[in-house]
Amino acid sequence: MPQTPTRLVSPYGSDRLVQLAARLRPALCDTLITVGGLEFPAHSLVLAGASPRLGCRGRWALVEDISPSTFAQILTFVYGESIELQPGELGDLEEAAKALGVQALEEACQRAQKGKDEDELDPGLKRHQQSEDFMRGSERGLGSPGEKQKPEKDFRSNGREQEMSHKHKAPGERPEMAGATRMMSSEEVMRGIESHKGSEESLRGCPDPLSPPGSLLTSLIPRPWWAEVPRLGEGQSALWSILLWPSRYGAPFSHSTPITAAWQVRPQDQRIPLTLNHSKALWSQNQLASSSPTPGSFPQGTESLSPWQIETSGQGFTGTLATCVSQERTLNCPSHQHPPLPSPARSRPYSCSVCGKRFSLKHQMETHYRVHTGEKPFSCSLCPQRSRDFSAMTKHLRTHGAAPYRCPLCRAGCPSLASMQAHMRGHSPSRLPPGWTIRSTFLYSSSRPTRASSSPGSPTSSAAT
């Protein structure tokens, strides 16, 4: 059986903005995309509505393995026009749509491939069943019961004859002739529907009719997010969500925008790589300052990158790579990369020698170890209360008036070290004892003076907090 061209119906055809842009193209285009030496003018607003990865205005080039003919088909689909694919082009178009993030086109290709696989299994029986169910559902909502019994009976008898001829087909019969006797074309089905009055209302009243191939594919393809908005008025679509697209794509060019040297094409070896942040879907434009024109170089200095970012950046640039010459950058769209999850031994290297409990910080392990030893090195200077860690003593000091700092001259309390410093400016330094420091105003004492500089309960760390 010869392969027929595959027809994909674009879901963007009902949008006024896309239709207007397609009618005006190449006028008012603020984007010029270079693919394989060919230039394609487009509107960044229309491209952004189809895929966030394409919503980049200016002059840029695709360096991914996408042919100019395939990219032209993608633009035709995005601008609301149907495309016809020859045998063998469906797979390349699906891969290109997946790489560029055009989800509607990718789903349409997958749906067409699935239908083609089902047709290859048993095309005659499947098409006949679809046509029969569709006509049965259409006649269910038309005319009186007496009028629809006869056509249904005739259609069933005709279907049985066709099925019997399919079963008892001669071995030498050509497959295309057999397919022609078994299939009912979509034009014949639509002609039969239009002959009835109120066919549109009957179709809406059908429980679940199956559409014939090529007739109602528009209802099977999901509409994009910006086409689901209700209409504001007659003939006007409420497509303000496109107009309120985030400002990272910039404003379109006007007729008065001067053409500067930024439109000059840069050589392939001078394109500046720039990674795409998938987690936030934002173009990392702030990495241009420290980037170099050497291919494969990092977008920014390694001193500002985390270790896992340096590791993944050193693996090279994969995925869809585009070069924005007007912004002097190359957009890299790698696959989702996440930092490796740390192992428990690496995240909690300190363990208790008594119970084996692990901790990420050493002072946490030391504080926990005092549970086994019963040591309480921190004591309150106002009462006999003692604590094994600094945080518990800080909470205890709040019971004395939430003023853990006390002036040695007037016994006034202060909530923080800064307020105590401001308070001490009101006293004469001559009244203070020799060797006095501001840290001695904190109302706690530790029985471990040798670790005063490094322990979490030291006056230095407490004053800093």
UniProtKB/Swiss-Prot annotation:
Q: Where is this region: Disordered?
A: 111-179, 285-310
Q: What is its main location?
A: nucleus
Task: Read off the SUPFAM superfamilies from this record.
Answer: beta-beta-alpha zinc fingers (SSF57667), POZ domain (SSF54695)
Annotated localization:
Nucleus
Kindly list the residue ranges recorded as spanning the membrane: none
Q: Which UniProt keywords apply?
A: Metal-binding, Nucleus, Repeat, Repressor, Transcription, Transcription regulation, Zinc, Zinc-finger
Q: Name one GO molecular function term.
A: zinc ion binding
Tissue expression pattern: Isoform 1 is testis-specific and is not expressed in lymphoid organs such as thymus or spleen. Isoform 2 is expressed in both B- and T-lymphoid cells.
List the C2H2-type zinc finger ranges: 350-372, 378-400, 405-427
Function comment: DNA-binding protein that binds to the to a 5'-TGTACAGTGT-3' core sequence. May function as a transcriptional transactivator and transcriptional repressor. Probably exerts its repressor effect by preventing GATA3 from binding to DNA. May play a role in regulating the differentiation and activation of helper T-cells.
Show the domain comment. The C-terminal zinc finger domain functions as a transcriptional transactivator.
The identity of this protein, by name, is Zinc finger and BTB domain-containing protein 32
**Organism the protein comes from:** Mus musculus (Mouse)
